[in-house]
Amino acid sequence: PKDMVVHPSAGHYSGTLVNAVMYHCGDELSGINGVVRPGIVHRIDKDTTGSLIICKTDAAHIHIAEQIKNHSCNRRYRGIVVGNVTEDHGTVTGAIGRDPKDRKKMAINEKNGKPAVTHYTVLERFGNYTYMEFALETGRTHQIRVHMASIGHPLLGDEVYGGRHVSGKWHLQGQTLHAMHLGFIHPTTGEFLEINAELPEYFEKILAELRRK
């Protein structure tokens, strides 16, 4: 859900996804990422909703991590961005690293950043807003948010990378971004699984309002 941090960190010691998973699973979680991030193979940002994979065993963790590394794990997101994206399809490839002016943020950093690739498809256009789908080849911190802001289309509500004006009349707390789809091979059975997470209510309401215009 929105506003839930994946694992404990400074300022977020409780109420995280890891706290909830540990309560549910106890010690039956992968230990590869240590006691702070048991079972966590990949993350989504605090204000990003949707699905992610949690592994109970080290073997499963290694298997899923390898799929993410070799791009066989399909990760698709839905988001609303500010502005009219004119190209129906596109790819953003700027390397991402820490923002030298603000260490809490990420930025396009071709010199010291890591390669990052985001593919996008326009789903609907609403004048000054565009509803989009994103497919990740890499999984850098804040990747979609940084890439879209870098081409002049920050995510609706993402004041960190788009400034205060990007929340519009909705006064949102954080980016309008949803981890919609996961496709991966089950580590034990070899079956290809597809997980789809429905859009959250707030997201659906914004889309409905934009469609009425």
Predicted regions and their residues:
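Pseudouridine synthases involved in rRNA/tRNA modification
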Residues: 101, 110-117, 124-127, 137, ...
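Residue-level signal for inorganic ion chemistry
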Residues: 21, 53, 79, 120, ...
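Residue-level recognition of beta-strand microenvironments
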Residues: 43-44, 84, 123-125, 158
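RNA pseudouridine synthases
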Residues: 1-91, 95-97, 202-211
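Residues that recognize and position ribonucleotide moieties
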Residues: 42, 89-90, 113, 142, ...
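Thr-Gly-centered strand-to-loop micro-motif
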Residues: 7-8, 55, 106-108, 132, ...
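Short beta-strand segments enriched for Tyr within beta-sheet-rich domains
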Residues: 64, 141-148
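Short beta-strand segments
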Residues: 90, 94, 116-118, 130, ...
